[in-house]
Amino acid sequence: MLTKRIIPCLDIKNGRTVKGVNFVDLRDAGDPVELAAAYAEKGADELVFLDISATEEKRKTLAKLVLDVAEQLNIPFTVGGGISSVEDVDILLKNGADKVSINSSAVKNPELINQLSEKFGSQCVVVAIDAKNINGKWTVHLVGGKVPTELDLFEWAKEVEQRGAGEILFTSMDHDGTKNGFANEALARLSEDLNIPIIASGGAGNIQHFQDTFQAGKADAALAASVFHFKEIEISDLKNQLRTAGISVRL
């Protein structure tokens, strides 16, 4: 049985970590490199960096950041946010990123998934899908959940897999930030429909929520931000409790 992965997510703006990070024991909680190293030490299995800045300098800033992080980190990390071309990905992977995450650009140009998986291998390609349950139908949204599309979550996920994605990062917009648990019914259906790993995102509030998403939601990995940043959950405690519950994790 493959071990379940715990993945902290860091939002990056102009090369700095944003969205409230409360790591008191760091000199500078805004420094993604320091945070990355701290999380790796605490037992994170992977990290995700989402770049939310929209500056012209972004590509250079991000490439430099990836290089700095890669030098400090011994666990895989994924970079996402505004990646829309083979060139973007080439730069990030050359600088040390293990995977890239694409979202809106995949919806606007689905062929990009094929191009990336053919050039770099599907293991590098994570497709992030944000969806909301509207009248019983899970609808894919873009631009951080602001713009609805006509796409059905499950149909789009199947297409993404067929086009060569290696993983899907599914965020439920209904659960994100609520701390009421993950969207386990939708996650379980994704896991049943697809053969590639599914990363659960949106809704983590306590350790039980992680246990539920691995058991009921059949997720392969769980991603969270604030519960880790604000030390509401320590990764070591989380993993110990998951193991006690019979869930296979890397300690």
UniProtKB/Swiss-Prot annotation:
IGPS catalyzes the conversion of PRFAR and glutamine to IGP, AICAR and glutamate. The HisF subunit catalyzes the cyclization activity that produces IGP and AICAR from PRFAR using the ammonia provided by the HisH subunit. The gene is hisF. It catalyses: 5-[(5-phospho-1-deoxy-D-ribulos-1-ylimino)methylamino]-1-(5-phospho-beta-D-ribosyl)imidazole-4-carboxamide + L-glutamine = D-erythro-1-(imidazol-4-yl)glycerol 3-phosphate + 5-amino-1-(5-phospho-beta-D-ribosyl)imidazole-4-carboxamide + L-glutamate + H(+). Transmembrane segments: none annotated. This is Imidazole glycerol phosphate synthase subunit HisF. Pfam families: His_biosynth. The keyword Cytoplasm applies. One of its GO terms (biological process) is L-histidine biosynthetic process. Its EC number is 4.3.2.10. Gene3D superfamilies: Aldolase class I. Belongs to the HisA/HisF family. The active site is at 11, 130. It is an enzyme of class 4 (lyase). It comes from Christiangramia forsetii (strain DSM 17595 / CGMCC 1.15422 / KT0803). NCBIfam families: hisF.
